[in-house]
Regions:
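Short, conserved, GDST-rich strand-edge loop motifs in beta-rich repeat architectures
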Residues: 43-55, 98-111, 304-318
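Surface-exposed loop and turn segments in beta-propeller and other repeat-based domains
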Residues: 123-136, 211-228, 257-285, 335-339, ...
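Short coil/turn segments that connect the beta-strands within blades of beta-propeller domains
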Residues: 49-52, 91-93, 148-150, 190-192, ...
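Loop/turn-rich, solvent-exposed surfaces of beta-rich toroidal or solenoidal domains
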Residues: 285-326, 330, 334-350, 356
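Repeated scaffold domains used in trafficking and secretory/extracellular systems
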Residues: 38-44, 80-91, 135-144, 179-190, ...
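Short loop/turn segments that connect beta-strands within beta-propeller blades
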Residues: 69-71, 119-121, 167-171, 207-210, ...
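Short glycine/acidic-enriched loop and turn motifs that connect beta-strands
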Residues: 58-61, 101-106, 159-160, 200-202, ...
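Solenoidal tandem-repeat scaffolds enriched in leucines and small polar residues
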Residues: 168-262
Length: 391
């Protein structure tokens, strides 16, 4: 049989079989049930709760994840690309992200701006353009807000130090003010802001008039011999900043037009051990990490990541967390922690939880009432931790 004959025989058989099937009783197609069209929607959150925290994904993820420390659950994500800085609206309405990008990824026209995200649906509300910003991630105090949430301050260095002032109500850039030789910002109600300086002083930048005015305290630390960690903590109720040096000296400053800086004390001596020093080849307990301490203002407790090492081991992960009572200058508790955490935070609610994170992106949550681990979150993030401001 030729190929043409075989081909004709095959198609004839197939046609006959199809006709028999279609002609058989009950072979009609079953009616298709009507399907209701799916309605798309957007999940909505509650405004941020005091038990919530955000942890940056670092170089691994381009977002900060929102978790509830009380339940250990993931709430959502806020877009925070690499080398961005995050700030939370004190009223809980918005998340602000200070960002930089180029029109052609790593080249082209540079754009610096602050993105405004709604805290309930996490939708982008606006981008506020500004002249520039310092591209250093992992800092709590490069982008800060005024106590009323109406003004934003973004640190810049191009090449001189300066601050971009933003009107967050009108959502516009206002002006750039010079801040020579200083960095790490803290907002000062009724004045403007303060910053740590390379000469060991605390600068106060008055922004009330048309012209800014800078005053400086007397030097109180050595930026060369015993620097202060830039991720310091702030007690908004007392208008006080709490600082920590590489050797473990604790400083407090009451903020204002003329800040008052108290004499420092040794964190190690507060725990009953020898004070930290800059002497070489001396092993002792030292603070370290990227985000070295966390403050719970309502109780006056400071939590510090500590490790055994030598001076200048200030980036090492911790083996213990020390709880310091700022009123008595005493370490009231020492807690062993796993994972060599390099970041620490504490929620600002009445029943606070302690949060630690290490380079392996494992987050541990502790119930401070019992001191026990409440949750372990794998692959949750390893960057800076930001907690919801105290109500």
């Amino acid at each position: 049989m030729t190929f043409a004959a075989i081909k004709g025989h095959f198609f004839a058989s197939a046609t006959l079989a199809l006709a028999l099937v279609l002609g058989a009783p009950g072979a009609q197609a079953a009616p298709v049930a009507s399907v209701e069209p799916e309605q798309s929607d957007v999940a909505r959150l509650t405004p941020p709760k005091p038990s919530w925290f955000l942890i940056n994904g670092g170089f691994v993820a381009s977002s900060s994840r929102i978790y509830d420390a009380a339940t250990g659950t993931l709430i959502g994500h806020v877009e925070t690309p690499q080398l961005t800085d995050l700030a939370l609206d004190p009223a809980g309405k918005y998340y602000y992200v200070s960002s930089t990008l180029w029109t052609k990824a790593s080249r082209g026209t540079r754009q610096d701006y602050v993105s405004v995200f709604d805290s309930v649906d996490l939708k982008l509300q606006a981008d506020i353009p500004m002249p520039g910003r310092l591209l250093v991630g992992g800092r709590l105090n490069n982008f800060v807000l005024s106590a009323d949430g109406k003004t934003g301050y973004v640190y810049n260095m191009s090449p001189a130090s300066s601050v971009n002032v933003l009107d967050l109500v009108a959502r516009k850039f206002v002006r750039t003010v010079e801040l020579p030789g200083c960095a790490s910002l803290v907002a000062v109600p009724g004045v403007g802001l303060s910053a740590l300086c390379s000469d060991g002083s605390l600068a106060t930048l008055s922004l009330g008039g048309k012209k800014s005015e800078i005053t400086r305290s007397e030097p109180f630390f050595s930026a060369t011999d015993d620097p202060i960690f830039d991720n310091f903590q702030v007690d908004r109720a007392k208008n006080q900043m709490v600082m920590l040096s590489y050797t473990g000296k604790v400083y407090t400053a009451t903020l204002g037009a003329k800040p008052v800086i108290a004499a420092p004390f040794s964190l190690q001596e507060a725990a009953g051990v020898v004070a930290g020093s800059t002497a070489p080849n001396t092993v002792n307990w030292y603070p370290g990490g990227v985000q070295q301490m966390a403050l719970h203002p309502a109780s006056g407790q400071l939590y510090v990541l500590m490790h055994m090492g030598e001076y200048w081991s200030h980036k090492a992960g911790a083996s213990e967390v020390w709880q310091l009572d700022l009123a008595t200058h005493k370490v009231v508790k020492r807690m062993a922690v796993p994972g060599e955490p390099r970041a620490i935070a504490v929620t600002q609610d009445a029943t606070p939880h302690l949060i630690t994170a290490g380079e392996d992106e494992t987050v541990y949550i502790y119930d401070l009432a019992t001191g026990k681990q409440a949750y372990k979150l794998d692959q949750a993030g390893g960057g800076i931790i930001t907690v919801t401001p105290a109500p």
